[in-house]
């Protein structure tokens, strides 16, 4: 069914409804209209890295972990599996007349906000700090979820429009101030590009941007999203965000006024109950029936595109056996093996010899943690393999001991004994081992969405520091005193500085993110060399937090690899491998006013197969405005056997080669353009850490 056909059918159906019936369809738990043969429908479903909150499904690595693959094709495949499992569940729910929450086909994912500040707890849900990477991977995910068949397999939704990245504690009343340069260079591109890619939904954010609530923002919603970009899908509020318009933002005084200003600014669907006041707004002449009708038509267009009203429902032939099937589990493990970033590997300490490794201690709060595999907005797996489980499976000849050693934070309560000091147990275990794997990090009770948990380390899900919690830092440093061979496996959804002592002492450091249900096996396979890490950082790891701007400051100056002041500890785009790649024969293949095509030969000059993430960056200056140090503008994941060479071609959209003026206009830079291609960004720190410089081309 084409979009135009769906629009016509939606218009015809909505024309048969009364005003009250139309209003009943503008809320997430839309009512049935039996006289028209319309079933109830709940729009709220989650699928960021698996079909969430509705029984068993594949739990993929979280979004920030997926981002570390720099691999649009893999992300698209994951999106396709998510919608396949979503269809299986939907078919069963319809069969048994279950139309409850988390049972529909409208997934409110991906989160394409920019991870501008590493303290933000929801950064784990994003594709990182870069506009190009977020645009490219977000579009790939959407393509996978929605498919390219006659009907959408599921509906994806880009969120949270548009300038939104904390703080969690004040998000319901916070005003994010962003100038037009930052809006159009950083905060808006991922939304623009996913609209171009055909995303069917957009979710508005809780906060205000430049004074207006995002879910009732005349400029962002009407002028930019609907006007400039021509978006004709549906807009949904974040859950409870319309209540904030009158209760927290005090933008209007009454519930009816909040409902009216949101609908007038093209927010079609309310996740919440504020639109229960639309009938009052209508009777007070704050809105017209046409306003209500247009919103209802957009929503039914989506339902028609999903095939809800077809006599034979599309995708009804997907067998139930495909849910959590062998193929999906294999993909999940492959993804989990490609997400971790090898930050340090002193003297090629890894991989370990799994046949001769004798005594291995696994110490830390994430040794046996399932929640550190999941992250937030997670599905529920039929099987979880923790770090300890994975190492036991792989290192079958080793004597393995496991000790928690510490809670995530000092203030975290144990299940039955209140506060408990376990550090001495961790030290004793490490002291008896030949190798200690420190399984450190966080979970979504510490960093996440508006957790309501406040202590010295976290504020409602946002970190207060970029270091580990004090109890884990104390454990790690004590382990360093008793064990020479320490490997750090860090599991969290953000950037963390491990501190000078641990960073210097550790033989190897792996940032494993929230790696999904099979993350522990993936980590063990990497430790043993069964898998070769190839992930790249989708965020900057800063040296502590001393030079970070204020969390509430939405200016990009001093933020991310594009505007950092000073050197990063580990730069965006960086990540080591167990093999080495060589780049040569770089050239510009073609250039016109739309695209630039560049190519390079990439050779695996090591003795292990691996995936290289080829990255292209632009550097340009313009006398009219501030420009980034570098801007990622192309990526491609390439698998290479030992000794194998491939010619890799990247097509670069000129969009990413333009400077953004203070008025938000993209213009040709007047200072020239340099292109760099390699396995990292072309900064001095990356060059030093990897031992080579990127290839340079003048455009």
Give the role of each language-model region.
Residues 1-663, 668-681:
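Glycoside hydrolase catalytic-domain context in secreted enzymes
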Residues 684-699:
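Short beta-strand elements
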């Amino acid at each position: 069914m084409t979009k135009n056909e769906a629009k016509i059918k939606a218009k015809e159906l909505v024309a048969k409804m009364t005003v009250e019936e139309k209003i009943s369809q503008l809320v997430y738990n839309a009512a049935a209209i039996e006289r028209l043969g319309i079933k109830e429908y709940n729009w709220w479903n989650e699928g960021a890295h698996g079909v969430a909150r509705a029984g068993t499904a594949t739990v993929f690595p979280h979004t920030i972990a997926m981002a570390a693959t720099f691999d649009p094709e893999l992300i698209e495949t994951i999106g396709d599996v998510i919608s396949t499992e979503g269809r299986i569940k939907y078919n069963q729910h319809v069969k048994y007349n279950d139309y409850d929450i988390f049972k529909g086909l409208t997934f409110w994912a991906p989160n394409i906000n920019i991870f501008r500040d590493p303290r933000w707890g929801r950064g784990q849900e994003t594709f990182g700090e870069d506009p190009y990477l977020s645009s490219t991977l977000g579009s790939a995910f959407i393509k996978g979820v929605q498919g390219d068949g006659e009907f959408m397999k599921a509906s994806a939704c880009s969120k949270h429009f548009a300038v939104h990245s904390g703080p969690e504690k004040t998000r319901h009343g916070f005003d994010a101030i962003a100038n037009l340069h930052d809006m159009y260079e950083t905060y808006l591109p991922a939304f623009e590009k996913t609209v171009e890619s055909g995303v069917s939904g957009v979710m508005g954010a809780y906060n205000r941007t430049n004074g207006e609530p995002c879910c009732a923002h005349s400029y962002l919603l009407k002028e930019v999203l609907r006007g400039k970009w021509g978006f004709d899908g549906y807009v949904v509020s974040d859950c409870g965000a319309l209540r904030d318009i009158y209760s927290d933002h005090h933008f209007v005084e009454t519930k009816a006024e909040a409902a009216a200003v949101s609908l007038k600014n093209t927010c079609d669907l309310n996740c919440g109950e504020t639109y229960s006041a639309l009938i009052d707004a209508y009777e007070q002449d704050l809105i017209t029936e046409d306003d209500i009708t247009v919103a209802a038509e957009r929503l039914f267009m989506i339902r028609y595109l999903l095939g809800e009203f077809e006599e034979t429902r599309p995708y009804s032939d997907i067998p139930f056996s495909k849910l959590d099937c062998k193929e999906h589990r294999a993909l999940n493990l492959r993804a989990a093996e490609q997400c971790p970033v090898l930050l340090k590997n002193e003297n090629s300490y890894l991989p370990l010899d799994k046949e001769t490794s004798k005594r291995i201690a696994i110490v830390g709060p994430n040794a046996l943690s399932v929640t550190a595999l999941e992250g937030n907005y997670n599905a529920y797996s039929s099987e979880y393999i923790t770090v300890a489980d994975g190492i036991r499976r792989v290192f079958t000849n080793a004597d393995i001991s496991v000790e928690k050693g510490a809670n995530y934070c000092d203030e975290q309560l144990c299940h039955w004994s209140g506060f408990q000091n376990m550090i001495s147990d961790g030290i004793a275990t490490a002291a008896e081992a030949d190798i200690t794997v420190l399984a450190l990090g966080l979970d979504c009770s510490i960093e996440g969405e508006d957790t309501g948990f406040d202590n010295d380390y976290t504020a409602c899900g946002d970190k207060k520091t970029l270091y580990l919690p004090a109890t884990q830092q104390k454990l790690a440093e004590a382990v360093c005193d008793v064990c020479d061979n320490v490997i750090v496996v860090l599991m969290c959804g953000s950037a963390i500085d491990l501190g000078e002592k641990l960073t210097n002492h550790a033989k190897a450091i792996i940032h494993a993110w929230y790696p999904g249900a099979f993350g522990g096996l993936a980590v063990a396979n990497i430790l043993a060399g069964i898998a070769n890490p190839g992930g790249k950082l989708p965020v900057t790891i800063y040296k502590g937090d001393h030079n970070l701007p204020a969390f509430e400051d939405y200016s990009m100056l001093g933020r991310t690899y594009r505007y950092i002041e000073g050197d990063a500890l580990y730069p965006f785009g960086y990540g080591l491998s167990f093999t080495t790649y060589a780049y040569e024969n770089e050239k510009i293949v073609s250039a016109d006013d739309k695209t630039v095509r560049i190519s390079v030969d990439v050779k695996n000059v090591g003795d292990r197969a691996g995936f290289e993430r080829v990255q292209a960056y632009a550097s340009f200056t313009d006398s009219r405005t501030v420009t980034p140090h570098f801007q990622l503008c192309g990526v491609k994941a390439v698998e290479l056997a030992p000794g194998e060479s491939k010619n890799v071609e990247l097509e670069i959209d000129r969009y990413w080669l333009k400077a953004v003026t203070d008025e938000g206009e993209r213009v040709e830079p007047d200072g020239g353009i340099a292109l760099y291609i390699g396995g990292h960004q072309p900064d001095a720190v990356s060059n030093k850490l990897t031992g080579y410089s990127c290839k340079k081309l003048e455009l």
